[in-house]
């Protein structure tokens, strides 16, 4: 369910059409995107837009109840992992609901992206900077 305004029409539309437990993936520039998945390609050049900026814009619009990340994200890119977890904690505080965080192996993560209604590609070049958001409800 949408919460605010977003300029990218494709991403805004996907968020507006999400039902409870539907998923979207926000990924770095290198994550393979399955042919059958809807691709929203925001990448312009390396680093633009960033993973974190895209997560912030998405969280401003989307109510989430679950997060899935690769186990490798914590150890290979700990600073960015911590930034993401800080945003998730802030989202929990703002909405007053707990958000489940699950870790799975990266290979399993890539397979799980097939369940997403859309995969949003950023210009991020930090290893494992990928997240799956599970849609919640605003009530």
Swiss-Prot record:
GO BP annotations listed: D-ribose catabolic process
EC number(s) on file: 5.4.99.62
* A cellular component term, taken from the record's GO annotations: cytosol
> Record's InterPro entries?
D-ribose_pyranase (IPR023064), RbsD-like_sf (IPR023750), RbsD_FucU (IPR007721)
Q: Name one Pfam family in it.
A: RbsD_FucU
The answer on whether this UniProt entry bears the keyword Cytoplasm reads yes
Sites where the protein binds substrate? 28, 106, 128-130
What reaction(s) does this enzyme catalyze?
A: beta-D-ribopyranose = beta-D-ribofuranose
Which biological pathway?
Answer: Carbohydrate metabolism; D-ribose degradation; D-ribose 5-phosphate from beta-D-ribopyranose: step 1/2
Its primary localisation, in coarse terms, equals cytoplasm
Regarding protein family, the annotation reads: Belongs to the RbsD / FucU family. RbsD subfamily.
Question: Could you tell me what this protein is called?
Answer: D-ribose pyranase
């Amino acid at each position: 369910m949408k919460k605010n305004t977003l300029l990218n029409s494709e991403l805004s539309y996907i968020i507006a059409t999400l039902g409870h437990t539907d998923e979207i993936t926000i990924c770095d520039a290198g994550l393979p995107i399955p042919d059958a998945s809807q691709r929203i390609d925001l990448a312009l050049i390396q680093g633009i837009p960033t993973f974190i900026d895209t997560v912030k814009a998405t969280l401003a619009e989307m109510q989430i109840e679950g997060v899935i990340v690769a186990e490798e994200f914590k150890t290979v890119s700990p600073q960015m992992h911590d930034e993401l977890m800080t945003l998730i904690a802030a989202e929990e505080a703002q909405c007053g609901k707990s958000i489940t965080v699950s870790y799975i192996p990266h290979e399993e993560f890539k397979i799980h992206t097939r369940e997403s209604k859309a995969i949003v590609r950023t210009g991020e070049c930090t290893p494992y900077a990928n997240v799956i958001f599970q849609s919640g409800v605003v009530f």
